Amino acid sequence: MKIGGKIVSATLVLMGVLVGLIMVAMSLLLMDYVSKSTESEMEVATSGIKNELEQKKTQMFQLACGFAGNHELIRAIQANDRKAVFEVSKKLVKQMNAEYLTVSDASANVIVRSYDFEKFGDKVDNQFNVKTALAGKPIAAVETGSQIKLAVRAGAPIYDAAGKLIGCASTGVRLDNNHNLVDDMKKQFNADFTVFLGDTRLSTTIKNDKGERNIGTKSAPEVAETVLKHLVLDGTLFGS
């Protein structure tokens, strides 16, 4: 169904919730603020959001698997050469037009982050994609993180030539400071969209009177309560 010229004011809420040690549940909530908007229009918009995220999961899954199988990266890890791992990671990110690549060892200790050479040594086994990859299964999902607050993440195990697990390649597309998702959704559905983590706006098409995006602001309690009464679409995982 075409929404056409009708303006629908909507909010996309992405809330990452850790379940147990490894499970991450995401909820996508789409809210209609205009009474003229129909339920069928909201279903179309919700379906569009889901399809967009599924496409990103597929893309990130393929990227992670490609990074994990790169022979130059594998050799650098085996040589225990952080600088080489960093340089290879930056090159791969540029070649594949990716946002970032985080390489960790078999114990989930970060070897390098392609965007910050000095930030390493911390454990990332709290990330579902990393923990799953180090268990031998590549996977993609929407997750929260310590450095990158919200992203579509994918992790893939890295093996040496003998088939020994030596690490994990984790990549993704950021949702916390990347406004392409909400901007694309606004163009497609003639609506305003906001990405929330909890009740804090991470990305939004809504701007203040200075023309700046309302990033970092909180949602009003009554808005959150209303959103939770509307359609909820559970996020899904993508894996091999």
What are the residue ranges of the model-derived segments?
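N-terminal cofactor/phosphate-binding cores enriched in small/glycine residues
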Residues: 20, 25-32, 41-45, 51-57
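Extreme N-terminal signal-anchor transmembrane helix of membrane signaling/transducer proteins, especially
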Residues: 3-36
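Sec-exported extracytoplasmic/periplasmic mature domains
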Residues: 69-72, 94, 134-138, 177, ...
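Conserved acidic
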Residues: 2, 174
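Extracellular/periplasmic ligand-binding regions of membrane signal-transduction receptors
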Residues: 43-85, 105-125, 130-131, 158-172, ...
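Intrinsic low-complexity, intrinsically disordered coil/linker regions enriched in small/polar
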Residues: 112-114, 120, 175-240
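Extracytoplasmic/periplasmic ligand-binding sensor regions of membrane-associated signaling proteins
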Residues: 86, 93-170, 221-240
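Short amphipathic alpha-helical segments
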Residues: 39, 43, 61, 82-90, ...
